[in-house]
UniProtKB/Swiss-Prot annotation:
One of its GO terms (biological process) is meiotic cell cycle. Serine/threonine-protein kinase. Has a role in meiosis. Belongs to the STK19 family. Its EC number is 2.7.11.1. It catalyses: L-seryl-[protein] + ATP = O-phospho-L-seryl-[protein] + ADP + H(+); L-threonyl-[protein] + ATP = O-phospho-L-threonyl-[protein] + ADP + H(+). This is Serine/threonine-protein kinase mug51. GO terms for molecular function: ATP binding; protein serine kinase activity; protein serine/threonine kinase activity. The keyword DNA-binding does not apply. It comes from Schizosaccharomyces pombe (strain 972 / ATCC 24843) (Fission yeast). GO terms for cellular component: nucleus. It comes from the Eukaryota.
Amino acid sequence: MPALLKINKKKNGQTKIDRLFSKRRKTSLAIEKNHSKASMCTGQSPLNIISYNVPPLIVLRNKTIRNSIEVLVEEMFRDIQMRQQTNVLVAQCPRMIVETQLIGLFQSNYTSVAEELEQSIRTGDIRRLYLNRSDKFCGESCLILRPEFDKLFTYYLCKFKDQEHIYTLIFKLHKLLIENPLPSYTSEELKFNWEERRLLISMGFLILAGTDSYGISLPNLGIFTHILRNSRNDLSNYLKKRPYREVIESSLYNRNVSVACKKKNEAFFGWKFRLCDAIGAGLVDSFMTTCGRAFRLTKKGLEMKF
């Protein structure tokens, strides 16, 4: 049936034709209803939830923050097949975690380790790195162990050893961070002039966190966030195609991720690493069923644009 038209008279005598019925963009609610109808047509029903009290995704040797980060780092690229072109990207990716992954790892027990985390940050054993606001990770931060942090600074000192001014700046910054490990710094605490701070920001060592507050970052942090964005997007798209946007754990682990890697020529994190991230970031819920642990895309995960 043709669309109905409405003719409006303007002051200058011109006419304007409005369509009373036009094709509108579907809302998330409409998409959800259509998805449910499609699932009903296949004869499938939602998974039967037994409990939201689920066992940990990763078994920890001990439940210290340091050990938790070490175990998560071990899972970063476990059981992931990638093309040769992505190996360089993986090699350059700093070994760190998203802070919210600890929520996905400990879940209801996270509050018991949060105080230990803050203490480790104050002593400098763990560094909190802030993600750039231009990335799609608003308010998120990463955690890196002191040995990995020092190793990366050593790499950049070697890289700029022939550029005296830059080398001196990086050396002074690293020394300051060792002697005074804080989550963020004022311009007075940094002891750099404006030109030096601006250079460190442009190189990726600092980010402006507030009016007079600077957070610590790293130049190759963008590689980590790039792979993280790919991993979140891949998991979200996979669950969106599933009936009721949910999947049993065993089916998820058996998925051949190498197919996606070959098509997109991109790197992805390992399944347990990305699931801890997705749960901690509120993109996915986990629950127990008669068939074992399962995961379901949340409203936040459905609406998030990567």
